[in-house]
């Protein structure tokens, strides 16, 4: 969520940013926010003036009564009653206008970084850099599920009976490999100075709306029936939520956390779930990292964070590349984002294994994550997140040979 004062003073810039994200249907929201914000401030000003007048006039009643001026006192009482009546009308009206402003502001996308390429969807994402030489075999490589089945390491049929498509049982050595990958990623990030964290796997609705857009929420989140709780789609949401409604000492920043968690996702949208694999599924495990820092440090942390993921995969001898996400592929709260993609020898192409994002102060503004500087002034922190590794997406078989296939 952008700053209301910024929108009020720069409506054309906000509209231009909406156009860059190919969300022209949201353009009317800017004028609507300005209109309702004006009404809210006018209602607030009128209410403040009336309260001051009420206090002033009310003091006259006792004095008039003491002077025996009953009729004048009654007239003043009637005036106070009229003021009170108007205040009862204004207070809900002011809240209605403020709620409408907040509702619209939650839908307006964050201002993207000038370096973000302009494009409508992920087909316009731009390759930044490659790391490692991709293996291009001249023989057919089995599907990853087939490889796991050879080791009795996966049971999709049983999972389908128990939970439906998009779930799996990992068994034996494959399950151990999965756990080992998670432990390796955990220790890798601890070695980078991050604090290990196991967060809650459910979060309340005010945290959900604080960390993501309504579109993301609808496409991803599972709600617990009858409860104000959602299963997390990624642990970054729970970790960022840790700082909700806090005022943090500037000297203690940055906060750097890494966490393991199961992740639960509807996977609604163009991609959907993968019928016979472990790539796009409803439940998986992931090691994640987040940073809460000063605004002037977020660009530097962004560069560090995606490089950590690249370093992790290169330590496993997996070729990777980074893609700069274009404007239309950025979620609404993101200022800048890049995908890390790993090479698949079987598919002979790269596929996404992680995503690094700088959200500026959007999440902090929604969740009221503030920082107190040395001068005593308060400001909103910047937040970033990045995938360390999602083990189901980590290549199980990266150095194939004709004999193995």
Briefly describe each language-model feature range.
Residues 110, 114-125, 131, 138-270:
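Active-site loop/lid in soluble adenylation, ligation, and acyl-transfer enzymes
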Residues 397-404:
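Conserved small/polar residues in nucleotide/adenosyl-binding loops
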Residues 386-396:
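Conserved phosphate/anionic-ligand binding catalytic regions in large, soluble enzymes, centered on
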Residues 204-205, 324-331, 356-358:
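Short, solvent-exposed loop/turn elements at beta->coil junctions and helix N-caps
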Residues 1-134:
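N-terminal alpha-helical targeting/anchoring segments
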Residues 298-335:
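Extended C-terminal subregions enriched in glycine
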